[in-house]
């Protein structure tokens, strides 16, 4: 038996010894009993046990879910590669377990419907149609859009507006993919890298033109609404009149009748999220009553001073990598801790009233800087074209962060209510809970250096427990998470949450 004195164990130890000294005569036998009793007292007290209660109070209702960016591999043909049928089946198996609340799927028209001035809806469409068929069959909502016009010269051209909306109508009404519920006309229009170059007035006018064109296709606006403004938190283009909260506020003032979903992008730092500063920042965004706000892209970047060591390691790996030149890559996304950080980010979003988030991104094989696969944008949970592009099948295996994100996506499903967790404030812990159809999930991340013991009050019937702990993440033959305990019932549960670990309890299917 090990004996540990927790935070309050020292005080307990002193009280017991004081009592014993006053209660026993000073002889040798009693001194022996004194030692035994003190050891037992210390052993029983163990670490401080935190009492946690998952209440019935709803933080936000009908959560839209945790999802991913899953673009249709439309750059792969230019690399001389394509996703094989076997690889598609692997992808479907993994995403089936993930059960994303929604998918953000962005395309480049130059890779699909537009070729040197010619509009062809069928061109290179196979991968997009396969992806959308999967989402349609599973009832997964899709936020679809275009990164930019297929040629920058078309940015204000009615020809692009007509082509883009015609293609959308073809997908939704002719092909039947009404899983597409929202449409983004520009990716990150506030950016100096984007076609609008931060010009809110231009973007606003294009939103109005796209909406008018959608209205010319009978029935389309009944199925699809515009989403926006799709801007980046903590970025301010000097050429723009607004920062990200300003873009959202102005969009609400000018275009609310056109916008069905508000979305923004977030790439916070590790220290920023773990300290709670990012959660506070989310409170700066205000949207009209009855509308929802999601993080359409989310991940981590380490440019802030507090994350300098992480940035240095990211740069070192990028320089040494044979798969990227470092253009817009998160080289630490394969590290175990990144899975913890994604979970913490999701908890901040859920507890903060934001309606959902999509992690950027599902697969390393989605995008490259330029036209070469030797400069991939590495952000994904795997590279499904690892063998085809680099002769390395091992690149196609899931990275550790997929394990945690699969749990956070599957067990905080679309439509669930996010519940308040009553717990004492403890540094290094983050928690979230949800309920759907009378079944519950409770998840806790311990990013401290010490194990934590929780006495968690949450009713479960036939529940399971998963653990995301480095070196101890059980999987099945497909590399998918397997619970460490099953058949969990009752109203109170003792949980040991390892240092640098995630524990999830659920009786959801």
Predicted features and spans:
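Hydrophobic h-region of N-terminal signal peptides that target proteins for export
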Residues: 37-45
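C-terminal beta-strand-rich structural cap/linker in extracellular carbohydrate-active enzymes
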Residues: 483-509
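Carbohydrate-binding surface patches
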Residues: 424-461, 468-471, 500-504
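Mature N-terminal, pre-catalytic/accessory segment of carbohydrate-active enzymes
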Residues: 44-84
